[in-house]
Amino acid sequence: NKSSKIFIYGIALAAGTGIYSGLSSLFGAGLSGFPSFDAVEMTRIDYVLIIVYILGGLALAYFYNITHHLTGSVAEKVPGIWSEVIAGLCLGLISTVIPAVMFSGEEQMGELMHTYTRYLPAALIGIAFLKILLTNLCIQFGLKGGHFFPVIFAGVSMGYGIAMLICGNSGDHVVFGAAIVTATLLGAIMKKPLAV
């Protein structure tokens, strides 16, 4: 029943928020282990660009779904251990050339938040698509891990890239772009846009 599901989700959300608030006030720190953006001052252009950022997030989500199905169908045809060897070789060779796509993306996102100006906007957008492709390849071919942090990293990278293409390196614009693209991407992949 849909109404009971909504009620249960509401209770879970309230309980999670309450427990988080209680533990944060008791022990301090909150989400200190996870990189967070600084507060931004939004301008009129940011509101106009929301549509562009949403389209960027949807493009990544569409690419995620395509590569998820494609890598899954290819992985079914590759014998057991060879699929993991192929995934490891692909990841190793590509990350030798582009180290930003290695690992889950949790630590790399924090680093990217401080070094994004060293990249061309097109490179950041390319890294986002490559991260999505490699994540699906590794998961479908049997390597351990999940898609949550790699998808967040890809969204941040794509948001930075799009914002830099349009607004330059301005910190406020790129932070807003990264947040909107990432929220759109996660909402589309999880199929729960209001949960993000």
PLM-predicted stretches and their roles:
Residues 1-196:
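Alpha-helical transmembrane segments and immediately membrane-proximal extracytoplasmic
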